[in-house]
C-alpha cells in the first residue's frame, strides 16, 4: 500500500497536471486550435508527446507481463519494429502529409479514393481507440488495486474524470504540453524500478544467473529473436512479416494519435524532426518496460498472472517516496495515452464522419462543440467496455489483437494509394473491406491455421496481403482515375512528373 508521502506525491502530480492542462485551454479559440494547435508546436514537444502517447500504462503492466512469461522477445516491438518505422515515416510520409494540409489520415484516403473508404478507415480507428481506452482503464485497475486497495470501478472513474476534464477544454495543445511533463515522469519512475530491481537481483549478472538456473522453460528469456516454431506470440517469421513490414509501419504512419501531432508542428522540418526525436527516445523504452518483467521472474517466480509482475515489484521493492514517484510516472503514462486517444478520436469523428456526412457547412464553433461532445462519449464508452480486457491472456495481447483486425488492410490501401497511380476508388474499398473480413476469418479459424495461441502478427501480415491483392485485382478491372485527379495525391519521383504540375514528390 502507498504511504502518506506517496499519496502526497501522487496528489501533487494530479493537481499539477490538471492546472497545466487547463492553463493551455486558454489558447483554444477555434476547431483548428482544438485539433491541430494552429500548427504551432515545436518538434521537441511533439517528439516527447509521441513517445508518451505510444508508451502507455498498458506497456508498464502489459509488456512487463509478456517479458515475465516469454522474455526479451517482446522488446523487438520497439527495437525491430517501431524505430525503423519511425525513420520511414519521418523522411517519406510525414512531410507528404504535412504539405497536404491534412487533419487525418482517412481524409487523405477520401481524397485519393472516395468517401466510403474514408468513412470505413475512420470508423475502424474510432472503434479501435474506443476498445484501447477500455484496456487502458483496466490497466489502471490492475495497478491501483494492490497498491491502493481501490475497487476497479472506482479507479477507472477517477482516472476518466481527471484526464477527461483537461482534454475536453484544452484540446491538442493541452494534450501535447502535459505529455512533455508526463514523459519525463514516466522515464524517472521507470528508471527507479529498474535500478532498485537490479540491485535486489544482484545486478545484471545476478539476474541472468537466477533466471537461467530456473530450468529449460526459461532458456529463451534472454533471446530477442525466437525460432519460427516457438509457441510464444513472437516467432521470427511473425516479427519480420507481421511486425516489421506491417504492424509497426501501419501504427507509426497511419495512427491518427501519432500522425496528428506531427501535422500540428510549425513546419515540415519540425514535422520530420519530431518523429526523429521520438525515435531517439524510443530506443530506451524496452529497458524501462521490459526489464522489470525479467526482474520479477528472478525475484517473484510463480505469479499466476504475468500482468501482476510490475505491480508486485513496485509493492515489494520500492521504498516510500520512490513508490509514489513511480506511481505518478505510471499515471503519467496512462493519462498521456488516454488524452491522446480522446483528442484523436474526436478529430476523426468530427472531420471524417460528422462534417463530411452529417453537417457540412456549420460554424467553426459548432465543430469545436462536436469534438468536445465526442470526447465525453468516448470516455463513457471506454469506462463501460474496460472489463472486456480481462478476457485476454494479458493486456498487451488484447491491444495487439485489436490492432491486427484492421492495421494490415488500412496500411495496404494507404500504401497503394500513395505509390500506385492505377489504384481505383473501388479497388481501395474492396481491398479495405476484404482485408478486414480476412482478419475476422483468420481469427475464427485460428486454431486450425496457426500453431500459436495469439497469432496477431500472422493475422496482420495475411490481412495486409489480402487487402493489397484485392485492391490490385479490383483496380485492374475498374476504370482508373484521370491523371489530373491524382495531382497532389500520388507520391512520385521527380523523373516521373513529365510536366505534371503541383504534384508533391517523395
Model-predicted regions and their roles:
Residues 1-506:
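Membrane-embedded helix-loop-helix hairpins and adjacent transmembrane boundary segments
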Amino acid at each position: 500500500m502507498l504511504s502518506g508521502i506517496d499519496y502526497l506525491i501522487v496528489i501533487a502530480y494530479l493537481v499539477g497536471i490538471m492546472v497545466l492542462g487547463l492553463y493551455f485551454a486558454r489558447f483554444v479559440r477555434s476547431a483548428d486550435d482544438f485539433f491541430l494547435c494552429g500548427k504551432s508546436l515545436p518538434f521537441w514537444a511533439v517528439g516527447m508527446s509521441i513517445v508518451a502517447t505510444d508508451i502507455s500504462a498498458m506497456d508498464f503492466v502489459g509488456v512487463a507481463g509478456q517479458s515475465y512469461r516469454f522474455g526479451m522477445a517482446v522488446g523487438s516491438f520497439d527495437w525491430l519494429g517501431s524505430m525503423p518505422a519511425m525513420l520511414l515515416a519521418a523522411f517519406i510520409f510525414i512531410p507528404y502529409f504535412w504539405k497536404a494540409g491534412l487533419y487525418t489520415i482517412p481524409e487523405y484516403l477520401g481524397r485519393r479514393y472516395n468517401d466510403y473508404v474514408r468513412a470505413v478507415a475512420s470508423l475502424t480507428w474510432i472503434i479501435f481507440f474506443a476498445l484501447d481506452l477500455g484496456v487502458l482503464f483496466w490497466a489502471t485497475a490492475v495497478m491501483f488495486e494492490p497498491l491502493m486497495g481501490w475497487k476497479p470501478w472506482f479507479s477507472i472513474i477517477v482516472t476518466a474524470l481527471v484526464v477527461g476534464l483537461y482534454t475536453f477544454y484544452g484540446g491538442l495543445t493541452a494534450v501535447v504540453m502535459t505529455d512533455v511533463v508526463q514523459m519525463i515522469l514516466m522515464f524517472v519512475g521507470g528508471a527507479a524500478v529498474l535500478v532498485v530491481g537490479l540491485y535486489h537481483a544482484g545486478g545484471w549478472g545476478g539476474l541472468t544467473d537466477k533466471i537461467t538456473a530456473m530450468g529449460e522453460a526459461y532458456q529463451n528469456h534472454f533471446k530477442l529473436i525466437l525460432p519460427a516454431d516457438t509457441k510464444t506470440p513472437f516467432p521470427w517469421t511473425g516479427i519480420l512479416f507481421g511486425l516489421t513490414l506491417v504492424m509497426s509501419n501501419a501504427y507509426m504512419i497511419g495512427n491518427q494519435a501519432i500522425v496528428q501531432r506531427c501535422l500540428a508542428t510549425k513546419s515540415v522540418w519540425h514535422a520530420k524532426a519530431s518523429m526523429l526525436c521520438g525515435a531517439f527516445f524510443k530506443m530506451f523504452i524496452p529497458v524501462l518496460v521490459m526489464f522489470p518483467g525479467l526482474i520479477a521472474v528472478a525475484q517473484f517466480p510463480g505469479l499466476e498472472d504475468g500482468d501482476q509482475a510490475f505491480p508486485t515489484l513496485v509493492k515489494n521493492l520500492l521504498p516510500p517516496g520512490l513508490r509514489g514517484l513511480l506511481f505518478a510516472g505510471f499515471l503519467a503514462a496512462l493519462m498521456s495515452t488516454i488524452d491522446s486517444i480522446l483528442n484523436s478520436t474526436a478529430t476523426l469523428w468530427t472531420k471524417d464522419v460528422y462534417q463530411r456526412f452529417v453537417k457540412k457547412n456549420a460554424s467553426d464553433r459548432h465543430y469545436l462543440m462536436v469534438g468536445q461532445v465526442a470526447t465525453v462519449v468516448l470516455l463513457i464508452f471506454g469506462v463501460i467496455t474496460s472489463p472486456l480486457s480481462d478476457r485476454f491472456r494479458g493486456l498487451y495481447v488484447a491491444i495487439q489483437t485489436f490492432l491486427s483486425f484492421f492495421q494490415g488492410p488500412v496500411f495496404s490501401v494507404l500504401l497503394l494509394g500513395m505509390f500506385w497511380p492505377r489504384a481505383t476508388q473501388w479497388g481501395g474499398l474492396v481491398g479495405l473491406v476484404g482485408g478486414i473480413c480476412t482478419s475476422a476469418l483468420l481469427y475464427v479459424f485460428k486454431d486450425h491455421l496457426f500453431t500459436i495461441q495469439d497469432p496477431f502478427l500472422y493475422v496482420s501480415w495475411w490481412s495486409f496481403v489480402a487487402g493489397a491483392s484485392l485492391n490490385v485485382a479490383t483496380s485492374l478491372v475498374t476504370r482508373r482515375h484521370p491523371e489530373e485527379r491524382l495531382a497532389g495525391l500520388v507520391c512520385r519521383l521527380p523523373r516521373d512528373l513529365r510536366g505534371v504540375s503541383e504534384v508533391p514528390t517523395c
